[in-house]
Design a protein with these regions (language model features):
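All-alpha RGS (Regulator of G-protein Signaling) helical domain and cognate RGS-like helical scaffolds
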Residues: 1-141
Length: 141
């Protein structure tokens, strides 16, 4: 999940250097959706900061972010990839849960997983889909 959070954080940071509010308005998204995506970006940054601090406090060197090449050429592709990444994020945390032995870390991971699920639901709803179409999240391991 550390690499996933780095990936999501980098994805949003790069996208918001390329796309501004007007770009979203031009393709039919409203300002509220744009602002929600910015809040999601801030959440992803906070997740990275938390995970780095937790890993360092355990005496382990955190994984460094990779170089990424996102298939984003316009707002529509940004929104599509964003929704996919958030869905993967939710299932990745669920898949990692059995490997977390610390109750404290598991609680925080569950909190982040819930936030990732809210991100997914928001994006799906904004795209005209059902926010939570299934009663259970598919586990990624």
């Amino acid at each position: 999940v550390r690499q996933l959070e780095h990936l999501e954080n980098t994805f949003y940071r790069e996208a918001f250097t390329s796309f501004q509010l007007q770009d979203f308005l031009n393709v039919g998204f409203d300002e509220e959706f744009f602002l929600n995506l910015q809040f999601i970006a801030a959440d992803e940054s906070a997740h990275v900061d938390f995970l780095i601090a937790a890993i360092q406090s355990a005496g382990v060197a955190p994984v460094q972010p990779c170089q990424y090449n996102f298939p984003v050429t316009d707002v529509a592709s940004f929104v599509t990839v964003s929704a996919i990444l958030e869905s993967i994020g939710t299932s990745a945390y669920l898949g990692a849960a059995p490997f977390i032995s610390s109750r404290e870390i598991l609680t925080v991971a569950a909190s982040i997983m819930a936030t990732e699920g809210l991100h997914t639901s928001l994006q799906r709803s904004s795209l005209g889909a059902i926010g939570a179409p299934n009663p259970f999240v598919t586990v990624s391991t």
